[in-house]
């Protein structure tokens, strides 16, 4: 996009910013504070260009009258959400899961003191995090089918499709040890 084109893009005024943040909070559960205004404006601008809509007010009207689970909301959510993830991300949390929860599960399994635990990966993006949990459960000597139920959800339909496919690029493995990668 050239300088002239970017100068012609509408600016998100205060009232429009409030209208969009309220709509996104109410319909999608996404929260945008004043510090995120620039990011929201740029991402909304992409949808305006894609749909050839001339103003934020017109786009807001379209969304306000659209079905919340409909195609345009799904497209907007895909535009707004950040989908940065990789295998074995958030090592400190995963270490705690293995040392505290998985160790206790393994001990209780011997006495059959409890059934499987449920782990929910909310905001799972393209699936690397829930798959990491299953890999670590296997490494800890657990049987994911017997000891563990892993649930994964994301607001982005596009990312959920990618998670179901289970195909990943090299960058998804940037923190994965060679041995684990070869094994799984």
List where the protein language model places each region.
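Conserved AdoMet
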Residues: 2-120
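Intrinsic, short, N-terminal disordered tails of RNA polymerase sigma-factor systems
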Residues: 6-7, 14, 140, 150, ...
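Alpha-helical elements of the RecA-like P-loop NTPase motor core of helicases
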Residues: 95, 131, 161
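Short, well-ordered alpha-helices that flank and scaffold nucleotide-derived cofactor binding pockets
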Residues: 99, 103, 135-139, 165
């Amino acid at each position: 996009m050239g300088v002239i084109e970017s100068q012609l893009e509408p600016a998100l005024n205060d009232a429009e910013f409030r209208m969009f943040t309220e709509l996104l909070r109410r319909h999608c559960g996404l929260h945008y504070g004043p510090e995120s205004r620039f990011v929201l404006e740029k991402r909304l601008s992409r949808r305006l260009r894609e749909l050839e809509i001339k103003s934020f007010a017109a786009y807001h009207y379209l969304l306000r009258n659209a079905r919340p689970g409909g195609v345009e909301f799904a497209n907007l959510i895909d535009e707004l959400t950040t989908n940065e993830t990789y295998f074995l991300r958030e090592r400190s949390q995963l270490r705690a899961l293995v040392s505290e929860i998985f160790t206790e599960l393994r001990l209780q399994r011997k006495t059959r003191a409890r059934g499987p635990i449920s782990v929910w990966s909310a905001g799972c993006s393209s699936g690397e995090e829930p798959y990491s949990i299953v890999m670590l459960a296997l490494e800890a000597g657990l049987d994911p089918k017997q000891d563990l139920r892993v649930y994964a959800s994301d607001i982005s339909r596009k990312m959920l499709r990618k998670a179901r496919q289970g195909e990943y690029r090299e960058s998804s493995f940037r923190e994965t040890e060679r041995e684990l990668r070869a094994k799984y």
